[in-house]
Design a protein with these regions (language model features):
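Short, glycine/acidic-rich beta->alpha junctions
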Residues: 106, 205-206
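Short, hydrophobic/amphipathic alpha-helical packing segments
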Residues: 107-114, 154-162
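Catalytic NTP-binding/metal-coordinating core of nucleotidyl cyclase/transferase enzymes
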Residues: 69-149
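Catalytic core of nucleotidyl cyclases, primarily class III adenylyl/guanylyl cyclases
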Residues: 121-146, 165-204
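Catalytic/regulatory signature loops of cyclic-dinucleotide turnover enzymes
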Residues: 184, 206-231
Length: 272
């Protein structure tokens, strides 16, 4: 794969992210990419196993912190966000083959643990859409750091699935879970709508739509990212990804200016 690290600054000043040039994307874009922070994955996995065992035994789930308070402070305005869309693989077949109680356990466990993983990387859960979790990382400042956080979060999600959730599920002869992940960035509008007498805050924008579409390109336990995320994240992460060769007749979102390339993650042993 081509080494682009020597052209980071030139690329970031000339090429767009989510329909905008990087200079427009954020006025505080770092010129010196800081090395991504690390987390204690063993602690995260241990906590995951504890919560999953409790859920299997008692049917008790823990709610992740809501992002409504943050968004309410930006109603009717725009935020630059990195959006992570994580989708549960095979859920349609689960609805046809599993008892309702077991289906509920698996989907609730998935959404619970993906949500907690997001929070460990200073991200926020926007909402749940069926069996998918939509999360975001505010990127008005420190865009590169937030790209790193989203990539680290996606890696952690896959580890949490295999080493946290599935290790407990196997103890009870349950099938393991897998996910497909898409990550994109862009400017988003924060809106409020009323459902009955209750106000709800939501986010609309390119990044959410495209992150969902990117996830459909992923294989199970794979991450697919936009060109903006690829060139925004730390160069050390790029060896873990390879550019996808997409047929523009079938994938209509490739655009010379707005989306010139899409990258997929390599298996861990290939990206090390």
């Amino acid at each position: 794969m081509q080494d682009n690290t020597g052209n980071d600054h030139k690329y970031q000043s000339q090429n767009p992210i989510g329909g905008e040039s990087l200079s427009e994307m954020t006025s505080t874009l770092q010129h010196d990419l800081t090395f991504p922070q690390t987390v204690d994955m063993q602690a995260i996995i241990s906590e995951t196993r504890e919560r999953v065992r409790r859920a299997v035994k008692t049917g008790t789930f823990i709610s992740a912190e809501s992002s409504d308070e943050l968004l309410r402070g930006h109603l009717n305005s725009k935020l630059k966000l990195i959006v992570l869309y994580v989708d549960l693989v095979g859920s349609t077949m689960m609805t046809r083959s599993l008892p309702v109680a077991q289906l509920a356990l698996m989907v609730q466990t998935f959404t619970q643990e993906m949500s907690f993983t997001v929070s460990r990387f200073n991200g926020y859960v926007l909402k749940y859409v069926g069996d998918a979790v939509i999360a975001y990382f505010p990127a008005d400042a420190n865009y590169n750091d937030k790209c790193n956080a989203a990539i680290n979060c996606s890696d952690a999600m896959i580890q949490v699935l295999e080493e946290g959730i599935n290790s407990v599920f196997r103890e009870h002869d349950y099938e393991g879970l897998q996910a497909k992940i898409g990550i994109e960035s862009g400017e988003h509008s924060v809106i409020q709508y009323i459902l009955g007498s209750n106000p709800h805050v939501d986010v609309l924008g390119y990044g959410i739509s495209m992150a969902a579409k990117l996830s459909t390109l992923a294989r199970p336990n794979q991450v697919v990212i936009s060109h903006g995320i690829y060139f925004g994240m730390h160069p050390s992460f790029r060896k873990k990804f390879v550019q996808m060769d997409l047929d523009p007749q079938r994938w209509k979102y490739i655009h010379e200016r707005f989306q010139p390339g899409v990258w997929r993650s390599l298996p861990l042993e290939d990206g090390e």
